[in-house]
């Protein structure tokens, strides 16, 4: 496990939950995750769930993704998706408004791995270097991803070579995020 990334993720999650508490006097609320089982759910309303992060349960690796492509993934991406279960969190990085993706449950973790495999299949077909997404942006063709070769975090336009380095590492990227409610 990449402890720097794990700590940076936990720290951002704490900042996010603290900001939510300060503004709403509750744990984060999600309508999108209503009806989706998770150990994070602490209460339910008629159309939303209140959640709090929980420790990740299960194998702490993305072995299915590695096996599918016979590659070794950056330790930071393994840590990012296996440190905790949590809801997706909105954030600001410099001028970028984003949604930081998280795994919500063990079932969601399997879905995330399938989506990462699909992303890598497309990149391989287009002869692009491998990246693994960690956040979405307002423009659905752009994502924030981790370059599996360099470990840098970049903004990329899906299906193209357009990439802009945002941070030298995932830990540094997470440290610079500001919660957005």
Swiss-Prot record:
Transmembrane segments: none annotated. The keyword Glycosyltransferase does not apply. Its main location: membrane. It is a peripheral membrane protein. One of its GO terms (cellular component) is cytoplasmic side of plasma membrane. InterPro entries: Syd, Syd_sf. Keywords: Cell inner membrane, Cell membrane, Membrane. It is found in: Cell inner membrane. Interacts with the SecY protein in vivo. May bind preferentially to an uncomplexed state of SecY, thus functioning either as a chelating agent for excess SecY in the cell or as a regulatory factor that negatively controls the translocase function. Belongs to the Syd family. This is Protein Syd. It comes from Escherichia fergusonii (strain ATCC 35469 / DSM 13698 / CCUG 18766 / IAM 14443 / JCM 21226 / LMG 7866 / NBRC 102419 / NCTC 12128 / CDC 0568-73). The lineage of its organism: Bacteria, Pseudomonadati, Pseudomonadota, Gammaproteobacteria, Enterobacterales. The gene is syd.
